Amino acid sequence: LENNSALQQIIPYVWIINPREKKVFVYKRASGKQNYNETRLMNKVSCGIGGHIDREDSANPIENAMIRELMEEIKMENYPKPKIIGYLNDDSDSVGKVHFGIVAIAETFEDVKKGDKEMAEGKFYNVEEFEKILNDSKNEIESWTRLSWPFIRDYLT
């Protein structure tokens, strides 16, 4: 299924935001096949925490997958319930052709730390700081992050 564009897999994609400080959690994906399951996204800058829906998520698959992915990929004291804000269908690259995104936000006032080996580093940035990252040609930005950013920015400002 992972490479069959006729059957897109649904992927929760959760932005972690601090609405009071108007900041977003930004991270760089790990490099090296030993650290990362999805090699097509290695070393890219991303704001979406997410992944495939698993059988264990079956009772409420989308919400359960969002929470499970947050707990796997980041560390924080309390995991907020994400709110779905939209959908993403991006056929511009090999990853997007086989996935359909459910974009959500998780609001927190807590500190967030990287959780697993798939994330090289991560921290909160304000809108202006993140837009500098987006516009810096040295950074390879994940397409879903770039496509959903205008909606997140509007939400924060």
Regions found by a protein language model. Give the residues of each.
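Nudix hydrolase/Nudix homology domain
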Residues: 41-54, 86-157
